[in-house]
Amino acid sequence: MSPSIKLIHEQPNVENTILYHAYRASSPARFSSGDDDKFIMYGGSGLCSIISGTLRNFTLDQCSIFVLSSCFIIWSETDGLGFEIPYQSIYLHALDDTGMLYLQIENNRLHESDENTVELRLLPNQEDSSSLSNPLFREMNGGALDIYHAMNTCSAMHPDPDDENEEEEEHSELPLAIPSNWLEKEFIANSGQADDLNDYEIRDGHAGMSVGIGYGPIAGIKRDAGGDELAGSGLPNKRNRTLQ
């Protein structure tokens, strides 16, 4: 059973969170074992606009994003609360060529509607990080591409338990409702390893949104409604547990 989405009232801070590069530099011998005492932050944005979609209890369309090894957090500084979202509950994350992140998330406490999923389009703003209140963002305040790659890496740390049924479910799964004008444009190589966040290659393709299925040289990750990740035809399916 996948973990549930939680409403939280404390955001990650320098006391309970360590940045990925700092953790790796200080703990190379146990880099693959994880750290139970602190969150490990792979990416984020201190000022992100919610372009479309709404979240319960959020009064403004501004938020902060934390891409942690354990979960994905959307935080409202104005309201003093946020949502801790397990990666198993993120059915799709994709990168739009306009610089937006497109997310389809399980509607578990996120929205008051009866819809099964919540769709969000988020636009990170890479303004002067020194003006941000959370010190974590003074060193790690990424754009959409940085956050996308961080989500790829962290999502790969949380494979689904029912891998033996994955192939059968792949053939029966209906496609997600991706806007028709967002077509595949580029493929971004990402092995899922923790040390390749800044080591990727972009190849030219068609116009529109970068989106794919599974792990490997893709630009989008999809999970089905049951929490399973589906690998596209011909693409390697890598499941790495670098940190837990």
Curated annotation (Swiss-Prot):
Gene3D superfamilies: Pleckstrin-homology domain (PH domain)/Phosphotyrosine-binding domain (PTB). It comes from the Eukaryota. Keywords: Cytoplasm, Nucleus. Transmembrane segments: none annotated. Its main location: cytoplasm. InterPro entries: ICln/Lot5/Saf5, PH-like_dom_sf. Residues 161-171 have a biased composition (Acidic residues). GO terms for biological process: mRNA cis splicing, via spliceosome; spliceosomal snRNP assembly. It is found in: Cytoplasm; Nucleus. One of its GO terms (cellular component) is cytosol. Residues 156-176, 222-244 are annotated as: Disordered. This is Protein LOT5. It comes from Lodderomyces elongisporus (strain ATCC 11503 / CBS 2605 / JCM 1781 / NBRC 1676 / NRRL YB-4239) (Yeast).
